[in-house]
C-alpha cells in the first residue's frame, strides 16, 4: 500500500491512519518510510525532495496512530546525510521516525 504526501490535504492525518488500519487490520505488517514524504523544510537531505510534503509532527502523529499494530519491522530510506544542513534537520527527523516506530513495536507483541 502506498500513501502519498498530498493525501494529507484531502483526508488529514486521521484519514491516513484509518486508511492504513483498514488495509492492515490485525495482520502483521512491515513499514517502509521514505524520508522524502517530509517537506524539505523538515528533511532537506534526500535524493528526491518533495515540496509540499508533510511536517515531522504530521508523520509522528500518523506513526503514533499505528499504536496497537503488529509491526514486524521497518525501514527508513532516502536519508542522504552528506547533504544535511548544519542543524541536521533530516538526521533528527529520521531519528524521530525510528523512535516513534520502535515505540509502537515494543508496546505491541507479535504473539501472546
Stretches with model-predicted labels:
Residues 3-112:
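Catalytic cores of soluble, metal-dependent hydrolases
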Amino acid at each position: 500500500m502506498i500513501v502519498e504526501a498530498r493525501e494529507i490535504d484531502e483526508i488529514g492525518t486521521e484519514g491516513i491512519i484509518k486508511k492504513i488500519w483498514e488495509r492492515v487490520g490485525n495482520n502483521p505488517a512491515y513499514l517502509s518510510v521514505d524520508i522524502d514524504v517530509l517537506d524539505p523544510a523538515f528533511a532537506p537531505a534526500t535524493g528526491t525532495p518533495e515540496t509540499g510534503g508533510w511536517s515531522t509532527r504530521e508523520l509522528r502523529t500518523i506513526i503514533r496512530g499505528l499504536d496497537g499494530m503488529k509491526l514486524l519491522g521497518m525501514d527508513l530510506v532516502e536519508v542522504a546525510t552528506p547533504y544535511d544542513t548544519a542543524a541536521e534537520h533530516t538526521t533528527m527527523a529520521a531519528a524521530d521516525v525510528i523512535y516513534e516506530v520502535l515505540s509502537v513495536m515494543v508496546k505491541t507483541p507479535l504473539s501472546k
